[in-house]
């Protein structure tokens, strides 16, 4: 771990010394030899999760450099630099020039063969049989009808996946991995309907083995964040048992009604799971959609929402989402109220809001709950949240 950060310091010093587009004081660089992100209660602790297939402008990099924790999604930089791997590293390097303490995660799906990864393409060219097939001998696909899956029940496929992730994270500008589609693997319904129960169990077993290997091989030096906590009937305690492999959880699909549960009951159960995990010191990257939730073909797995207009007043909605976050948050909890992750169509990209800049202060205790009403006091704000009526108040002192 020390060697990784030492190398980063050397590279940054040399790079910054020759940088013509950014005016940065290299003497001020102070790399934190800790895989956890920087955290402060001074203001709202924010997370960033995004994708852009072309290169980022200087303005965009300056904006990104303000976030302590960033995930660059699939396709990042792939059109400009030829692959997601190269595009992510280029973007990470640019951010690190300005803020070397920002923690940057490389997105890698645990099973879905998303396009744009050059190493995946090369591997599948040599091993086309590594893709999952159904009982008819046809490629098993996502709801889009074309994107396939890696057959992670096979040992050689898992070894390739681990080698790929290890190679990218060895780059000094990458601090860890964001792991997606865990829930698709763990709940029986998704793969049962595609490849049958026996194969689904083999995929799940392969996944558990792969995550254990990931933790043992990369966990000491790299931040491992998984899209894992979720209220589902198949999970005990909302999937918290799987956090043993990871440093924390990304949160989505958090705030709607599902599986016959009322909105407020589903959300209350999710809040409880996040509170428990955050209090145990797990990193929480809470992603909350500003737009109205839409039904999805894989209900309860993917969070799909209506876009919001750039001219729309969503201040009340934003305050409500921040109140949800604040009744859950502990040290190493971060929030991203968003309008989708693609920068081209997002109404909140490059924007900030007054609630992000107002003083927050340390919490003066855990949140208190009475029925569906939560309250919590911070040094500079009192939070009141009613999840049954979907209302909130942030009373700044």
Residue ranges and their predicted role:
Residues 6-14:
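Sec-dependent N-terminal signal peptides
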Residues 1-5:
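Positively charged n-region of N-terminal signal peptides that target proteins for export
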Residues 17-18:
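C-terminal motif of bacterial Sec signal peptides marking the signal peptidase cleavage site
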Residues 24-397:
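Glycan-processing catalytic domains of CAZymes
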